[in-house]
Structure formats: C-alpha cells, structure tokens
Curated annotation (Swiss-Prot):
It is found in: Cytoplasm. InterPro entries: Ribosome_maturation_RimP, RimP_C, RimP_C_sf, RimP_N, RimP_N_sf. One of its GO terms (cellular component) is cytosol. Keywords: Cytoplasm, Ribosome biogenesis. The gene is rimP. Gene3D superfamilies: RimP-like superfamily, N-terminal. Pfam families: DUF150_C, RimP_N. GO terms for biological process: ribosomal small subunit assembly; translation. Residues 194-224 are annotated as: Disordered. This is Ribosome maturation factor RimP. Belongs to the RimP family. The keyword Cytoplasm applies.
C-alpha cells in the first residue's frame, strides 16, 4: 500500500464513511473504542473485536483494507501499532494473547456495504428482538434498501416466511455461511483485486482453486 493510497483511505475512514452497524458490547466495546481510530489512521477498517477465554485470554481483532483484502504484512502492521496503545490504555485485566486476522471467507457482516458486496450468498442473521416471529434467520442475501436487507430462506420450514425484510438497526449478529459458491466467489474477487481487475470478470476456472496464504493468518503476541 503506497503512502498516498494509505492516506486517502485513512481520510475516507476518518470521515465516518460506511460505519459499522453491528458493534461490540462490554469490554469488547471498550477495546474497539480505543483501537478503531488507530486502525482507521493506518488506512484499515475494523471488522470485529472479541475477547475470549481461549488459551487463557485471547483478544481477537479482525481488520481489513477498504477493498476487503488483508495481508500478513497488514496484520503485522496493525499488531505493532495497536499493541503499545493497548499497553498504555490497559483495558483488559490480566495477561492476554493478541491475535490480528482478516475476516476470513465466512466473514462477519458488520456494515451495510458487506451485505451489498456479498448479495446472492447465504448468511446467518440474528436480531436483538423478535422479528417476524423469530430472532434467527438463514438465507440468501437479497439487496434491500438503505435501512434494511432482504433474506430469502434456503431452508423453508413450516410457518416461516420464505422472504423476510430485516431492518439493519435490529441486526445483532450476521455472518456468511461457508459454501462452495462463496469460496469460488471470494477467491475470484481476491484474484481480481490483486490483478487490478473488476470482480465479476471471467477469470477462469483455475483461479477458483487458488487461495493466498497472506489472508489466512496474522501476528499474535502475549501481553501482560
């Protein structure tokens, strides 16, 4: 990423463009409030923060470039930058393991643009309150409008509406479901971005079998 491109992306993010509609609570929210401005300054977008009890305590930070990519070098840059900030702010009690990663193929959907980018693919969506008689939905993402998304169920059950419109402000959690179609599309988009081509171009069947290791791992550190 060149300095000029990074500066442009940071400016866009700082302006609040395409903010997350799904946010953390509790200690995760506290960590997110500390690191999100730092990550934005680097030209990346925060996807999710989650503190788990895995291996003692693990602080997982998912981030990405505005184009959806995230390399190993990107993960290392974010790690080196946010680690000292967390040391100073000290939002977490005790020792923890810091893990920086890309969102992955079956990624969380946290922005309105995420639903648009992955329209046509299957997602699981949970709402904060009962909506249309339930709180959990699964189905194909159909583009809605600025305030909602339409989900077309891929597993029709008795008494459930096959097509549901869900307001964005009711969504508490959402993520893509791993399918063969999703894997092919994700790899095609990644390939297109790396080659400077437009996602959706016919890139050939061989490209669907390729996956870069760069977006599969990140840097992790132990912090006191």
């Amino acid at each position: 990423m060149t300095e000029q491109v990074q500066a442009n992306e940071a400016e866009t993010l700082a302006a609040g463009a395409d903010e997350r509609i799904i946010r953390e609570t509790g200690i995760d929210a506290k960590v997110a409030s500390i690191i999100e401005p730092v990550i934005n300054t680097l030209g990346f977008r925060l996807v999710r923060v989650r503190l788990s009890g895995l291996n003692g305590q693990t602080l997982q930070i998912m981030a990405e470039r505005p184009d959806g990519t995230m390399t190993v070098d990107d993960c290392e840059l974010v790690s080196r930058t946010v680690a000292p900030v967390l040391d100073v702010e000290d939002p977490i009690s005790g020792k923890y393991h810091l893990e920086i990663s890309s969102p992955g193929i079956d990624r969380p959907l946290v922005r309105k643009s995420d639903f648009a980018d992955w329209a046509g693919h299957i997602a699981k969506v949970e709402t904060s309150v009962v909506h249309e008689g339930r709180k959990k939905f699964r189905g194909r993402i159909v583009l809605g409008d600025a305030e909602s998304v339409v989900i077309e169920s891929d597993q029709i059950s008795y008494g459930s509406e096959p097509v549901v419109r869900i307001p964005f402000d009711l969504i508490s959690d959402a993520r893509l479901v791993l399918t063969d179609d999703l894997i092919r599309d994700a790899l095609r988009k990644d390939k297109a971005l790396r080659e400077g081509r437009i996602p959706g171009d016919d890139l050939g069947s061989e490209e669907a079998g390729e996956q870069s290791d760069e977006t599969a791992s990140g840097e992790a550190e132990d912090k006191e």
